[in-house]
Design a protein with these regions (language model features):
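Short beta-strand scaffold segments in enzyme catalytic cores
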Residues: 44-46
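Glyoxalase I/VOC metalloenzyme domain signal
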Residues: 1-6, 11-30, 48-199, 205-294
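Membrane-interface helix-loop junction between the first two transmembrane segments
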Residues: 31-35
Length: 294
């Protein structure tokens, strides 16, 4: 299997300039980004140690990804989907199609497409990606960049040299992916994407959910489902059916992060057990961001 890591998370926004300004208040360095030729979208990036957040906006509804347009129309700004990084996209697509042909999964990897971003300074960054169809909502897609490691990181910064984040953000620790049932979530990633869970099922009391974990070479997926009528996860299931609900990021100092965010007028809550900092989604353009100590 060559699906190795969480490559990036897409955050749908209506206005890129306003989104970039708000994310700077959250202590992120935000790149100048660029446009996707013939795809009707533009972006700004938050480049992390081993992945990135993509603030993505639609500027041509007829050319843009239909699911992205629909998401903004129906749900407003917030977490849209994410991409798995692949070291051999053709092999991963072939495995996906084999599992589909054998009736193991209803998900299907589509024909890989070439992608490109052009910065305002005319620098270009390319990739190949495969969207995944089937299911009832937008699915995580697969991507293989035209560069790796430090070369890829430099390209993500575009026209300017790499910069650190004022708040010291490190990596994507994990993604919270919600499903109506844990069985459905496990089958989705096991049978569709070929991932393997590790460990036993556990309970998250604060979210009233049952959960399992799928570790990757970089980061991990927390698949969680509500186990009570009072679970806060039920609202997400009712609205979205399934998908990414939260992003957990590392920082070097939780108390320092909380103080910095409060100084920017950002509303937060702290976990009484771990001290984790959760940014109010209203202050992150609808995205649920949780900070943990690296």
């Amino acid at each position: 299997m060559t699906i190795r890591y969480i490559d990036h998370v897409l955050i749908a926004v209506p206005d890129l300039d306003a989104a970039a300004e708000q994310y700077r208040k959250l202590g992120f360095h935000v790149t100048a980004g660029g446009t996707h030729p013939d795809r009707g979208t533009a972006n700004r990036l938050v480049v992390l140690e081993d992945g990135y957040l993509e603030l993505i906006a639609v500027h041509d509804r007829t050319a843009a990804w239909p699911e992205l347009v629909r998401h903004l129309d129906q749900n407003g700004p917030g977490l849209f989907t994410f991409a798995f990084g692949s070291s051999d996209l053709d092999a991963d697509v072939a495995r996906f199609r084999s599992r589909n042909a054998e009736g193991i999964t209803s998900l299907q990897a589509e024909e890989p497409q070439e992608g490109e971003l052009v910065t305002s300074g005319a620098k270009r960054r390319g990739w190949r990606s495969s969207r995944v169809s089937g299911g009832e909502r937008v699915n995580p897609f697969l991507i293989q960049h035209d560069s790796t490691d430090e070369e890829k990181r430099l390209k993500l910064f575009g026209d300017h040299p790499p910069q650190s984040h004022p708040l010291g953000y490190g990596r994507i620790e994990r993604l919270e992916v919600v499903f109506p049932s844990l069985e459905e979530g496990e089958a989705y990633f096991r049978d569709g994407y070929g991932l393997s869970r590790v460990g036993e099922q556990s309970v998250c009391p604060s979210r009233q959910g049952d959960r399992i974990f799928f570790p990757l070479a970089q980061g991990q997926l927390e698949v969680i489902a509500p186990n009570s009528p009072d679970s806060p996860l039920n609202d997400f299931v009712s609205l979205r059916k399934y998908g990414v609900r939260g992003v957990v990021l590392t920082v070097p100092d939780l108390d320092g992060a909380a103080s910095y965010l409060a100084g920017q007028g950002i509303r937060i809550t702290r976990s009484p057990i771990s001290g984790a900092v959760q940014i109010d989604p209203a202050d992150a353009l609808g995205a649920r961001l949780v900070l943990v100590k690296e």
